[in-house]
Amino acid sequence: LVERYATLGGVCLNVGCIPSKALLHTAFVMDEVKTMAAHGISYAPPVIDLDKLRAFKAGVVKKLTGGLAGMAKARKVDTVRGIGRFVDAHHLEVTLTSGDARTPAGGKKTIRFDKAIIAAGSEAAKLPFMPDDPRIVDSTGALELPLIPRRMLVVGGGIIGLEMANVYSSLGSRIDIVEMLDGVMLGADRDLVKVWEKKNAPRFDRVMLKTRTVSAKATSAGIEVAFDGAAAPAAPQTYDLVLVAVGRTPNGKAIEAAKAGVNVTDRGYIDVDRQMRTNVPHIFAIGDIAGAPMLAHKAVHEGHVAAEAASGMKSYFDARQIPSVAYTDPEVAWAGVTEDECKAQVIKYRKALFPWAASGRAIANGRDEGFTKLIFDDATHRIIGGGIVGAHAGDLISEVGLAIEMGCDAVDIGKTIHPHPTLSESIGMAAEVFEGVCTDLPPARKP
């Protein structure tokens, strides 16, 4: 196993999913405490100790990376620390490093292989006009919590940018978000995103859509950024911290996979078949480098397929759905096909929606702004997609994913007894809405 960093686990475990969720949990608790005044319970304003918060985050990561290292050792996995680049179809040259992926440890090592699985991931995309300044960070830098800025700009309205905007806003920063497209959270249906927008309108100073950054200048007062577009401020704005979250670039070219004969696209992706096999039969590729969506759970599933296929098993990647979750507040989650995709692909569908304003548990939690939506094939009534917006939506979407994989229809889901009172029963109730038998909502008006 060739790994350039000091710990195993890749982006997700070290500088992605896990540390961000540790900080998002902290942010959620801070925000939740503020709402308790309406319940008759008030607290003093929080006192933030950044060193302790960083230590908490680091402890979470260390516990998991340590466990992963232990499992690798137990399975007798030989780890080589360094940066690997292909020499040909059966050799990889590794430049040995100290573990920070930069400092040479001295020497190189050539590894001969019969079969290889490429899991080299991706790097945060950069904007060429951004100066080299510690006050301009990517997601990795933002997770290090260098400071709590008075004003912060998030460039990019995708999931990563919005999650970090959530964290820094809860810690006390004033946030501007700029997105060149006409909406944030690309990929999710707009009705889900609208709930997020309404809830977060008071949280951020500006959400500038159809707007882009055109220049940035480092000054003693901060990073001075100029904008252009529909919502661009007339004058440049100055920020204490700028997060650039404009996507990620796969590392297909960086590892020189083409020298092994592997087809690498202009953007750095590696094409694979359903066994995760490249055009070179004994070389496989998984994860970010094998194509969108760039999600850890997709990569893990692909890794299982590739390992089994490499060992001779007839394993294939044939998932009907890959769930996506924005761990914002409220969370937004979806699985299967979206309404937008149904319309684009001319799929005949029907949807059913259960509002959390009718959920006893959501009301008791003081978080009834969300809803659960299921999408069914118009002819078969089998579920083909679904979306949930609200607190803990990410924990709820798995049932929708399983229902899609199992080919459940609305009756299967509606007749499944869900525990009461829970948020998960909104899934069963949405199916009942589709069948016209939901007694938890007023009767539907006849056309």
Please describe what each predicted stretch is:
Residues V11, I136, G161-M164, S170, ...:
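Short glycine/serine/threonine-rich phosphate/pyrophosphate-binding segments
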Residues E3-I148, L181-M185, D189-L192, K198-R203, ...:
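Glycine-rich flavin
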Residues D78-R81, R85-A101, I111, L171-R274, ...:
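A Rossmann-like FAD-binding core segment of flavoenzymes
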Residues C17, K115-R174, V178, V207, ...:
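Glycine-rich dinucleotide-binding loop and its adjacent helix/turn
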Residues L1-Y5, V11, I18, A22-V29, ...:
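Flexible, glycine-rich terminal cap/loop adjacent to redox cofactors
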Residues I160-M180, K198, R277-H282, A290, ...:
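Active-site substrate-recognition segment that forms the wall
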Residues D133-P149, A235-A310:
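FAD-site-proximal beta/loop scaffold in flavoenzymes
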